[in-house]
Amino acid sequence: MIIDIHGHFTTTPPQVAEFRQRQVAQFQRDGSVLTETPAVSDDEIRAGIEPHQLARMKERGVDLTLFSPRAVGMDHHQGNEATNVVWARFSNDLVARVCRMFPQHFVGVGQLPQAAGVAPRQAVFDELQRGIEELGFVGFNLNPDPTGGRWSDPPLWDKDWWYPLYEKLVAWQVPAMIHVSGSCNPHFNAVATHYINGDTTAFVQFLTSDIFKEIGRAHV
């Protein structure tokens, strides 16, 4: 069996991205949280998957993909924790629907409701639990820089900031894939630069710290 461990739902119907744009705009305007998400039909999901991800998988002989929301669209650097909880739940629900519609081809990996300047705590833990228990997810994407290229939150070895999340991952026996999202730093193009920066920065932070020694089998 050939398993692609890194796939994203990049072909959601347009109302999905439009909702996030409206949500961020409303938050920036008056600080309120837009919670009413748009309807997405099974036919729209099927139209986004069958001629795109699924067709490419069949062409290349891929049997199964670990499938998560669009990474650059996680958008943790915009909004706040409350907006990002709504956005993560909506995004994860769409991925779960893909996995239910095509169970032989896709297994879900979740988006966490991280936010710039907010340590990952109960809101993140709640979505972690929901993803595992209700949606059947087998892993999650973990953004090492929710500030979107500013890198102003603590590094991954910071015990007060990150270790409680690592401990939850170990307790649930699920892995997290380190994956940055969008960039609001004009020096860093999101995909061409920020993604590479993120991987390298996270790798070195793990390599030069005692995370694996202190947490044990840290699932990252």
Language-model features: locations:
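Helix-coil boundary/capping segments in enzymes
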Residues: 1-219
